[in-house]
């Protein structure tokens, strides 16, 4: 997705602007929602060290936040509260605003402070799609304003499993984060029949840790940038299915409970992780549905042996794959 910005400035919204910062909460991560159980994270959480405030920080504030694009302030919470600022394509959340609606701001100009206890600034980005609607997009996608962003670690496809379809309600785990509990009966991939829910566990480890080296329990893999599947009949070599499961350059319309598969856990926020890392797992677990509802109808295929090849990419272009051979017996 290409986007025309108001200027050519590139960098990060916290100092130093020209150096990479660790990101712990990634775009499209699951997040709690009172009405539907869970929705998608609409930005990226750029980490700051609350235990090392910048010089001159006011009480209960830790780091200065800067605009990464020139523009007029479209929204700003009143000073003194944990709120947000909207300028140009970008939203800066969990900040104590230091600008007012209507003001003109240059890229690199301070717009607020991060708030103690949050350990990050949430950076959201919106762009107008082909349909003219403004939607959230991934600020770490190739060609965006956040630069430099380097990730030399390959994403991982850890496991492929087969289940009877199930759509459990989202629950919670320690730290008040969401989880989609295990549900459905696991199937023997040597005897698949009928409707099958194909589930893949995959994630994107980060090669850049920054100050997470000092607090290693805060390091967590990201949501992969892209995932695709190819299904091949092993007897004939025919490709019977090939499709992109998702691409996380923009906000998804698919409900979170169909994008994610049972077994998914949200990444624990930094403040919760610091409290519970000795007794609970901080990183999230990503399980994805390869065929969202109505799932994979094996009755449409001839009986026989097939190979599912799942390929995953990260935002830096690294890729990995995993094969799973199955037998359909309807």
Task: Explain the meaning of each model-derived region.
Residues 3-7, 21-67, 90, 168-187, ...:
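Short glycine/threonine/proline-enriched tight-turn/helix- or strand-capping micro-motif at secondary-structure
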Residues 23, 65-67, 71-73, 102-114:
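A structural signal for short beta-strand/turn segments enriched in small hydrophobics and glycine
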Residues 25, 48, 75, 94-97, ...:
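A residue-level detector for short acidic-glycine micro-motifs
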Residues 58-98, 119-125:
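Zn2+-dependent peptidoglycan hydrolase active-site motif and core
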Residues 84-87, 105-123, 144-148:
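Short hydrophobic beta/alpha edge segments that flank linear recognition/processing sites
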Residues 127-154:
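Short peripheral tails and domain-boundary helices/loops at the edges of structured domains
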Residues 148-172, 176:
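Proline-centered linker/hinge motifs at extracellular inter-domain junctions
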Residues 168-330:
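Long, low-complexity serine/threonine/glycine- and acidic-rich segments characteristic of extracellular
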């Amino acid at each position: 997705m290409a986007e025309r910005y108001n200027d050519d400035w590139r960098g990060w919204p916290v100092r130093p602007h020209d150096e990479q910062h660790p990101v712990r909460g990634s775009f499209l991560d699951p997040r709690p929602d009172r009405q539907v159980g869970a929705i998608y994270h609409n930005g990226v959480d750029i980490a700051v060290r609350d235990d090392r405030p910048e010089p001159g920080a006011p009480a209960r504030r830790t780091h200065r936040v800067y605009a990464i694009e020139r523009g007029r302030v479209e929204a700003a919470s009143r000073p003194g509260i944990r709120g947000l600022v909207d300028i140009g394509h970008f939203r800066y959340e969990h900040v104590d605003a230091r600008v007012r609606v209507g003001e003109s701001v240059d890229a690199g100009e301070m717009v607020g402070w991060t708030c103690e206890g949050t350990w990050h600034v949430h950076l959201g980005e919106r762009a107008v799609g082909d349909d003219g609607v403004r939607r959230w997009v991934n600020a770490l996608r190739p060609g965006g304003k956040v630069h430099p962003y380097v990730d030399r670690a390959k994403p991982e496809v850890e496991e492929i499993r087969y289940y009877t379809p199930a759509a459990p309600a989202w629950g919670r785990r320690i730290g008040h984060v969401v989880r989609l509990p295990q549900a459905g009966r696991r199937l023997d991939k040597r005897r698949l029949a009928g409707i099958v829910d194909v589930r893949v566990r995959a994630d994107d480890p980060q090669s850049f840790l920054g100050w997470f080296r000092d607090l290693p329990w805060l390091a967590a893999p990201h949501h992969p940038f892209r995932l695709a599947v190819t299904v091949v009949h092993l007897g004939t070599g025919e490709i019977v299915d090939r499709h992109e499961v998702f691409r996380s350059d923009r906000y998804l319309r698919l409900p979170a409970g169909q994008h994610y598969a049972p077994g998914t856990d949200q990444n624990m926020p930094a403040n919760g992780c610091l409290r519970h890392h000795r007794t609970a797992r901080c990183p999230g677990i990503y399980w994805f549905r390869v065929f969202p509802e109505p799932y994979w109808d094996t009755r449409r295929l001839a009986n026989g042996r097939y190979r599912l090849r799942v390929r995953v990419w990260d935002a830096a272009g690294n890729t990995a794959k995993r094969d799973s051979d199955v037998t359909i017996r309807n």
